[in-house]
Amino acid sequence: MRFGSFFLFPDRRGEGIPDMYYKIGERLEEIKPKNFENLKYQYVAVISSEEWIKNNKKFSMGIEWDINLDEITDTHVEVNIDSLTGTFSIPSRKNTSGPRHNFAFALDEKGIVFVDDEGFAGRLIDKLVKSKRYLNPCLERFLYDFLEGIIHRDYKIIEQYDAKLDQIEKDVLDDDSTGSIRELTDIRSELRDLRIHYAQLMDLSQELEENENSFFKEDNERYFHLVFQRVQSLHEMTSSLADYTSHIRDLNQAQIDMKQNKIMTILTVVTSVFMPLTLITGWYGMNFVHMPELSQPLAYPIVIAVCILIAVACLVFFKVKKWL
């Protein structure tokens, strides 16, 4: 299931992405520093994996980190002695089961470096450059806005999933669920992907909030807690919708069982009605010579009347028992 109008950015895989450097001030101000060791301000950098391999030492983070963006499978953060390193694997909101937006990052108290060959991180930061102004500029607030930018449209997307599931449930109740159950399976799979994504973001925000390396000011740790709360809310909403899909599947199965029960009831009634008639037919089909009633002129209509009476009696009995 796709919600194209809520896809964050155009996909530019394979395009050459320029390296970008920003100073965290009242706004994110693009800069071209040569020495990151003696900066008097915190910074944000977005570079390619090739640039990281060639010049990672200029960021003075004290790490030897070989990252292969093609091997990224999840979102997580690792605590090192002099830095934090991690990866992002973000499902596309246009098609959650399709290719993901994968990039890596490394940060210390001086700033953060995103390693991104696709350009997703750069485009998100470009939106922040155009829309954000900071009263108290700091790395923590930038990280809050960056993480919030990843999820800020997700509430609307989840509302659309909810509305679609409501429609599928209505179709099931109206006995018009052709094609809907297959779509329900797709939605369930997409919700599972989102739920896993949110769980990983929750772990990442908690790790940042713990501030094991004391890179962040204690007063600013609240930004990561705010991110955690927002992502937790989304995680709970997707879990609730996943349960809703299970409810709809059970409801659809119940509808199928009801149809089958009705068919079996009809077959049982037909069998029960015709069983005594079959017995009578078989009785008189034995062709014994000495069957005195066969010589009576009223025998034939009497047998017909008896058969009709038996059939009516059976139908009345089933009706009284509410089997019909």
Model-derived regions, located:
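Switch/coupling subdomain of P-loop NTPase systems
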Residues: 98-179
